Amino acid sequence: MNTVIYPGTFDPITNGHKDLIARASRIFDKVVVAVAASPKKNPLFSLEERVDLVRQVVKPFPNVDVKGFSNLLADFVQQNQANIILRGLRAVSDFEYEFQLADMNRKLAPNVESLFLTPANHLSYISSTLIREIAALGGDVTEFVDPIVSKALQQQFALRK
């Protein structure tokens, strides 16, 4: 079985993430969306909330599983009997950082490969950071995220007022 791990913070999951997951689900037998705890990033949503949102968004894809993790990605990949990490590249600026991560993961787990996909053109400018900023200021994010995520963002920011 050909299993790929797609890691990220997914705070929140965007239509760009969903596009990559949909494409990966057609390429690989199994896709594991690995939601990172990322406490240093001070996420808006808890790990449990992010895992739940991702699960709801990827429900249409039967070969996609969603798991939270807080250990090294290289270890998580091996624990899930995978040897491929999928990453999205939106712009050249993403490449340098992703290249460093790929090199480090290769050092930590020599049998693990990193595979990069570029997003669809109409999704290339979307980032979770921008989505959070727009939502925090009361902007409409429905074009960029699943309706479930849009509602969760509205609720989250309503609680903070």
Swiss-Prot record:
Name of this protein = Phosphopantetheine adenylyltransferase
Q: Where is this site: Transition state stabilizer?
A: 17
Where does the protein end up? Cytoplasm
What sort of enzyme, by top EC class, is this?
transferase
Q: Does the keyword Acyltransferase apply?
A: no
Q: Which domain of life is it from?
A: Bacteria
Family of this protein: Belongs to the bacterial CoaD family.
Q: How does it assemble?
A: Homohexamer.
The family database entries (InterPro entries) matched by this protein are listed as: Cyt_trans-like, PPAT, Rossmann-like_a/b/a_fold
**Residue sites binding ATP per the record:** 9-10, 17, 88-90, 98, 123-129
Keywords linked to the UniProt accession: ATP-binding, Coenzyme A biosynthesis, Cytoplasm, Magnesium, Nucleotide-binding, Nucleotidyltransferase, Transferase
- Which taxonomic lineage is given here? Bacteria, Pseudomonadati, Pseudomonadota, Gammaproteobacteria, Oceanospirillales
Primary localization: cytoplasm
Q: Which residues bind substrate?
A: 9, 41, 73, 87
UniProt-listed Enzyme Commission number(s): 2.7.7.3
Q: Biological process GO annotation list?
A: coenzyme A biosynthetic process
Q: What does this protein do?
A: Reversibly transfers an adenylyl group from ATP to 4'-phosphopantetheine, yielding dephospho-CoA (dPCoA) and pyrophosphate.
Gene designation: coaD
- From the UniProt record, list the reaction(s) this protein catalyses: (R)-4'-phosphopantetheine + ATP + H(+) = 3'-dephospho-CoA + diphosphate
